[in-house]
Regions:
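Short C-terminal domain-edge/linker segments immediately following a structured domain
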Residues: 34, 48, 83-87
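Histidine-centered, metal-coordinating catalytic motifs and their short helical/loop contexts
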Residues: 42-64
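Short, contiguous, well-structured surface segments enriched in hydrophobic/aromatic residues
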Residues: 1-38, 61, 113-124
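Contiguous, well-ordered alpha-helical segments that form the cores/surfaces of helical PPI scaffolds
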Residues: 12-16, 45, 52, 108
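C-terminal, helix-dominated tail/subdomain
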Residues: 69-167
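Secondary-structure capping and boundary motifs in well-ordered enzyme cores
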Residues: 6, 39-46, 99-106
């Protein structure tokens, strides 16, 4: 940091600021320059939420349980997210149930933002292949353990369909 002496390149600055500050930087730059961000602020905020949950070792699988009415997302799922999930061939019933869950909604936003922002084909393919392997190989290794748990199996199926769709689209 000292080596830049007040003239830090933006890519270095972005590496050291908090996620919240990154959100503010994007909003500021868009307002000042007229640039249109490829992602909206709410999606970026949902990415921040899932990132923070993972960074603080929250057990995300516990958050997959059906939520009480008081816990549900008060804001509606944006149309572009619904369309994103619909393009994966996920039916309306599953789509509504899964997107009503806060954690699943955050992960879907993360995948949407990734799909919009990462333009390097090599990077996209590498990470999507890792996600594909996680869902199709690692998580399926002992699927008989979870066969009786409809919540886990349906959530797994949901993310398999979404990931397969992302793999097929590129």
């Amino acid at each position: 940091m000292k080596k830049y002496r007040g003239e830090m390149p933006i890519w270095v600055f972005v590496e050291v600021i908090s996620f919240g500050d990154l959100e503010d930087l994007i909003a500021f730059y868009a307002a000042e320059s007229g640039w249109e961000s490829p992602i909206d602020g709410k999606s970026l905020d949902r990415v921040r939420q899932i990132r923070n949950a993972a960074a603080h070792n929250n057990c995300i699988i516990n958050d997959l349980r059906p939520e009480e009415a008081s816990e549900r997302n008060v804001s509606r799922t944006p149309r572009f997210i619904t369309d994103f999930v619909c393009r994966a061939g996920i039916g309306e019933n599953m789509r509504k149930k899964k997107l009503a869950n806060r954690r699943i909604n955050q992960i879907v936003h993360l995948l949407y933002v990734y799909n919009k922002v990462v333009t390097s084909e090599n990077t996209r393919n590498t990470r999507l292949t890792e996600l594909y392997d996680l869902l199709h190989t690692r998580m399926s290794m002992h699927k008989d353990y979870f066969a009786g748990n409809g919540l886990l199996t349906s959530t797994h199926e949901f993310f398999v369909k979404l990931t397969d769709s992302l793999m097929d689209s590129h």
